[in-house]
Design a protein with these regions (language model features):
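Cytochrome P450
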Residues: 1-406
Length: 406
């Protein structure tokens, strides 16, 4: 069958498009004017063969249809990838999440107060709430001023746009010449504090004292394979937060609000049964994954579904297609906010295996606190005009979500 992931009909309803592709052609070769790659939408193949520690499919050439900035830090393959993750994992421990819970609650309250103060009781939910909450929390976790959040979002948007729209050699250099000096300043300041304190081999005991307890500090003190992180690796941590800590959670919040309000009976039910908030979040992640697909690159010639693929072939695995696989999910084409958690959580929106998203717990926590507060503080929320999808063909979210609450 003919299938174009960038065609208007695919962009308008990617869930239906990738479900049809999975049913009619579970392994598809796409050749477009700018890209050539294979596409798979089969849940079990993606989870069990591609997302595990595959000897064939590599992450180190980037997560895009062409090779991009990679092979450093998080953008590596095992075993180094696992060692690098382990160096930063303590920052996502339950004790740390409890600390961030207070910040999430504070920011949610501030954003809701701002909404309630608007005299006409209407506005864009994306602009007023879905964007600033994850963006500000990302700043808190990274250790940057919350006031920088829109600046960071601007940088992230540029990087993501370049990543998924035909990146060319050297195309990232101009924007990185803005980003790297900014973060180098933060990292140098932390290194200077350690030097002033006479600490040459820092460990976690300096966090919350000599250094602020944030991820830029953790990048400075972390050790991998017995050595400190290189500056390039430290910057990779910053970039991971910049690009991974914002848009996906922004789209989670906007997508869920959109689905709840497009069928008002869902919103009414959630108000009556607030215990369903967690189920609704997981169903949103399954039904409307913020990232529609990911890429891997073959390290050697291989064969899939009888098709020979060369070394350095690109494979796109469809998250939205896998998330609607009827072999895994009952009635997969329906948004069911009461879908059992055990079933809904089988979604692959946070990945699986060695590259499972480290930020998944914080994204879930942000959404859980946000919607618990929204149904209580703004019970009359309703759609107030047409919505608009995000521009990127690899993402799925609402960048315009007009609502009213008076």
């Amino acid at each position: 069958m003919k299938f174009d992931p960038m065609a208007p009909e695919t962009l308008a309803d990617p869930g239906a498009a990738y479900s049809e592709l999975r049913a009619k052609c579970p392994f598809h070769l796409y050749e477009g004017p700018d890209f050539k790659f294979a596409i798979t939408s089969d849940y079990r193949e993606i989870k069990e063969e591609i997302l595990q520690d595959s000897p064939v499919w590599s992450f180190r050439f980037g997560n895009a249809a062409k090779d991009t900035i990679s092979d450093v830090g998080f953008k590596t393959d095992p075993p180094f990838h696992m060692a690098f993750r382990a160096a930063l994992t303590p920052g996502f421990a339950p004790r740390q999440l409890a600390k961030y819970e207070a910040d999430i609650t504070r920011i949610c309250d501030e954003l809701i107060d701002t909404m309630r103060a608007l005299p006409d009781a209407r506005g864009d939910f994306h602009e007023l709430f879905a964007l600033p909450l994850p963006s500000r929390i990302m700043c808190v976790m990274l250790g940057a001023p919350e006031a920088d959040n829109l600046h960071y979002k601007h940088w992230a948007d540029i990087l993501q746009d370049m990543l998924f729209h035909d990146p060319k050699p050297g195309s990232f250099e101009p924007i990185l010449k803005e980003i790297y000096p900014h973060f180098n300043g933060h990292l140098d300041a932390r290194a200077a504090k350690l030097a002033e304190a006479g600490i040459s081999e820092p460990d976690n005991s300096v966090l919350g004292g000599v250094l602020p307890d944030d991820f830029m500090s953790r990048a400075v003190i972390a050790r991998v394979e017995g050595r400190p992180l290189t500056r390039e690796e430290q910057l990779n941590v910053c970039l991971a937060f910049l690009t991974g800590g914002q848009e996906t959670t922004i789209s989670l919040l906007a997508n869920l609000m959109w689905r709840l309000l497009e069928a008002p009976e869902r919103w009414e039910r959630l108000k009556r049964e607030p215990a369903l908030v967690e189920n609704a979040i997981e169903e949103s992640l399954r039904f409307d994954p913020p990232v529609l697909a990911h890429f891997r690159t073959s390290l050697c010639p291989t064969t899939m579904h009888g098709v020979d693929l060369p070394e350095r072939a690109k494979l796109m695995f469809s998250i939205i297609g896998a998330n609607r696989d009827p072999a895994i999910f009952e009635d997969p084409e329906s948004f069911r906010m009461d879908r059992p958690l055990g079933e809904a959580r089988k979604h692959l929106s946070f990945g699986s295996g060695v590259h499972f998203c480290m930020g998944a717990p914080i994204a879930r926590l942000e959404a859980k606190i946000a919607f618990a507060k929204l149904i209580e503080a703004l019970p009359n929320l309703r759609l107030d005009g047409p919505t608009e999808r995000i521009g990127s063909w690899m993402h799925w979210g609402r960048v315009k979500l007009p609502v009213a609450w008076g």
